[in-house]
Amino acid sequence: MTYKFPQNIYYQIVIWKDTDHFKEVLDILHSRDYTDAIAVGGDGTVNQVAKSIIGTDIALGIVPAGSGNGLARTLGLSMNVEEVIKQIAEGKQVKIDHGTVNNIPFFCTSGIGFDAHIGNLFATSKKRGLQSYVKITFRELLRYRSKEYTLKFNDQEIKRKAYLITVANAGQYGNDFYIAPQAKLSDGKFHVVILKPFTFFSVFGVLIHVLRGKANESSNIETYVTDQLTITRSEKGPIHFDGEPEMQKEQIIYQCFHQSLKVIVGEKFQGL
């Protein structure tokens, strides 16, 4: 990949080995006059780099190398290495929002329920890869039971039994799988998507709506718009942020921070 950058651009490539090494990389990034931080990897890698430059003048660029590449796709960046490096070199920049879930930053989506449950099982599975993820998903699809949640936002409180709740800063999980097609990255708002309990047969209708980019039109889905949200559940359990699972307490607090991150975008970006 190194030879593909234009000759007039100075860059340094660093491969970090562990958390301590990554901290050293960040020290270098912030102590010198670098203008951009380019993350090469999937949404987990992108999250690590992005959260380290929130509120700075350093712009995030992405060379997508993951399975979903949700943020890269939303930013209109190419999945082709040569093309995305051209986009990075052109350097078109905008500012986007980021969210926090119990003070943990995320940039695409976060949530609780089925998707967090699957992420937690996959993280502890001995088998890796897409095949293992799909196998776990189908195994758990009808085993998993919807849970009761209390949501507080916009001076209201609602109680819902939900299969999952997704808090979307960006509209998609990845792979152009849009759970919140009307969400915008720079409007200072989350789209809170509640998937209600469904039957075996109705799940296909939900999937068709999502695959067509019309999840908000499904009768099994409710969507609300807010910049702050508190979700309370009866017990501790997994959440996810940009697909990364973590066990968290009963109360989950979300906050949206308006245009807090500078990013490099492609010509097809429509998030403003």
PLM features: what roles do these ranges have?
Residues M1-A37, N47, K51, Q156, ...:
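ATP/NTP phosphate-donor binding region
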Residues W16, G55-A59, A65-Y163:
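Catalytic core of DAGKc-family lipid kinases
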Residues V40-G42, V63-A65:
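Glycine-rich beta-strand-to-loop/alpha-helix junction loops that act as flexible
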Residues R145-K147, K161-Y163, S186-H191, V225-D227:
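A generic structural signal for short beta-strands and their flanking turns/coil linkers
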Residues I104-S110, K159-R160, L164-A168, Y173-G174, ...:
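Short hydrophobic-aromatic micro-motifs
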Residues Q48-A50, L71-R73, D176-F177, F204, ...:
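Short glycine-/acidic-enriched loop or helix-start segments at secondary-structure transitions
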Residues T166-V206, R212-A215:
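Internal helical hairpin/lid segments
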Residues K159, I194-L272:
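ATP/nucleoside-binding phosphotransfer catalytic cores, i.e., glycine-rich phosphate-binding loops
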